[in-house]
Swiss-Prot record:
Keywords: Late protein, Viral contractile tail ejection system, Viral genome ejection through host cell envelope, Viral penetration into host cytoplasm, Viral tail protein, Viral tail tube protein, Virion, Virus entry into host cell. Disulfide bonds: none annotated. InterPro entries: Phage_T4_Gp19. GO terms for cellular component: virus tail, tube. It comes from Enterobacteria phage T6. It is found in: Virion. Pfam families: Phage_T4_gp19. One of its GO terms (molecular function) is structural molecule activity. This is Tail tube protein gp19. GO terms for biological process: symbiont genome ejection through host cell envelope, contractile tail mechanism. Signal peptide: none annotated.
Length: 163
């Protein structure tokens, strides 16, 4: 086996780079594409349905479900990035004394995740995530020993599906 055989095994001729990506959630504005530091494409799961027959089990396909989606966001001094998620979450369920909440058509949004080739211009994969809304706007860590770092926080979003 030669090194060339390894690279030939990948039809595009190159490996995907996990650091060449952008996340666009148009509801949060253009700047979010630069504030989203990390994410993963959410898992799609088809549960199995075990069916027993005469001491044997066969597995049939069940329903498709989708895991929640988590993004890591770089915070800014004005806390605008985090506040946008808090405000979005408040559309689904308010934080005050009153019980408030919008309709799904008001709080469910879409996102696009794009992965790029090494030239950082050619889109190699694009996934659209539908029915998003933030279920958990993560904590902000404060620590006197955290020098030379950018503050980040995680947001977990529920979703309906991706394509």
């Amino acid at each position: 086996m030669f090194v060339d055989d390894v690279t030939r095994a990948f039809e595009s001729g190159d490996f995907a780079r996990p650091n060449l990506f952008q996340v666009e959630i148009s509801y949060l504005g253009q700047n979010f594409t630069f504030q989203c530091k990390a994410t993963a494409l959410p898992a799609g799961i088809v549960e199995k349905i075990p069916v027993g027959f005469m001491n044997r089990k066969i597995n049939d396909a069940g329903d498709r479900t989708f895991d929640d989606w988590t993004v890591t966001v770089m915070n800014d001094e004005a806390h605008d990035a985090r506040q946008k998620f808090v405000d979005w979450q408040s559309i689904a369920a308010g934080q005050g004394n009153e019980i408030t909440g919008g309709k799904p058509a008001e709080y469910k949004k879409s996102a696009v995740v794009r992965q790029y080739a090494r030239d950082a211009k050619t889109v190699t994969k694009e996934v659209e995530i539908k029915g998003l809304w933030p279920t958990n706007v993560g904590e902000l860590q404060l620590d006197w020993d955290s020098n030379n770092e950018i503050q980040t926080f995680e947001v977990t979003l529920a979703l309906d599906y991706w394509e």
